[in-house]
Structure formats: C-alpha cells, structure tokens
C-alpha cells in the first residue's frame, strides 16, 4: 500500500481451513512489541494488519542458505528463551482434529499413523508463547535485519512444536537440520526422542491438512504437499549428530 508519504505492508486473512483466534494474535503482538525481530504494526483490525514497508524484502525461499538457517535458529532461540506467558493457547491436537474431521473420504493408510498422536500427547508440555506457523514466508529478510512475522496462530504451546515445525514445513535436509539445531541448542541438550515424535506429528498434521485442501479445492499443489508429507511419514528423518 502506497500513500503520499510512505509505503506499507498490508496483510489480510489467510487460509480459512486453519483455526485462527484473533485474540491469540493481539496478545502476541502486545507481548512482543519490544523485541528486535518483531515488525511492529501501525494498524490492526480483525484480519487486517499494516506495518511500515521494508525496502527489498525477501523471504526464506530466496534466502535459503546455511548462514541464514543459523540466523533463524538464533532468532527462534531468542524468542523462546524469553518464555512469554500467553493466556491464549494453540493446541496442535485440536488443529489436527479440525482437519481430520473435515475430510469426507479419509485416504487409505492414514489411520496407520494415528499412534503418533498418542506418542505426541505423552511428551507434549505447553509452557510458553510459540509462533506455530513457521513457513518460509513468515521470515522476512531485509538488508540489515531478520524479522519473524504473521502471528495469527501464535499461542501458548510446547516450544518443540516450533522447532519441529520449522524443519518439517521447510523440508530441511540433513545438513540444514543439523545446522539449525546447533544454532538453536546452545545452552541446553536437544531431546532427540521428543523431537523425533514432534517431527512425525508435524508431518502427519500437514499431510492431513494438505489432504483436506486437495479434497476441497482440487488444486495439484496440495496433492504434491500431501505426497511429500506421506513420504516423510514413511521415511522419518535421521537427525542425531
């Protein structure tokens, strides 16, 4: 959006199949208002959010490199280390159930992976504010800074969900994954058993989401995503270093 005096980013509502609670976003914006990686909005109202335009903006898809993965790992560590206490929650199981229950014809074999839900529940422990939507487009690279944007799904959650989500949603390869984990886990040991379960859960979650979207919209991109996530479910990542 361009005015006589300035340029702005304008964001409106995204995917209607996702569970969005606007109170979650408003709370996150308030909690993060003084963080260096946060792009403070000049206007927000329901689905509409406006921030000051950043020159030459790029997202992770065009800036994918090991050095930038290190930057992302450090940013997420800084975010999580503050342990912001949010009243509004993001429950991954509720998210999964929402997708699962909207599918008219469940794909053959989906129920074979339902054991992942039980494993996830045993390890899940919400204890801080998380972003919960770490797709490539939510990392904004400018000349001098890296911002984490779009907090529509932010809420009280287990921070391992964010860690697994970044790896899963961006389909990091082995080298990228290890680079990310080394950048993130600087003062604590990574719980690989927990991360493995959370990675499997994220792949199951996005497989179910993509299956739903392909059924409802019949757009090939969702079929491709479903195939990729099913491949990951059948061939889990090996991440110990």
Predicted regions and their residues:
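ATP-binding pocket architecture of kinase catalytic cores
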Residues: 1-90, 107-108
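An alpha-helical support segment within catalytic cores of ATP-dependent transferases
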Residues: 84-132, 137, 142, 234-237
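Active-site acidic catalytic loop and adjacent metal/ATP-binding pocket
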Residues: 1-5, 10, 118-163, 175
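Short amphipathic alpha-helical segments and their helix-coil junctions
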Residues: 145-148, 177-194, 237-240
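Charged/polar, low-hydrophobicity segments characteristic of intrinsically disordered regions
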Residues: 113, 196-205, 230-241
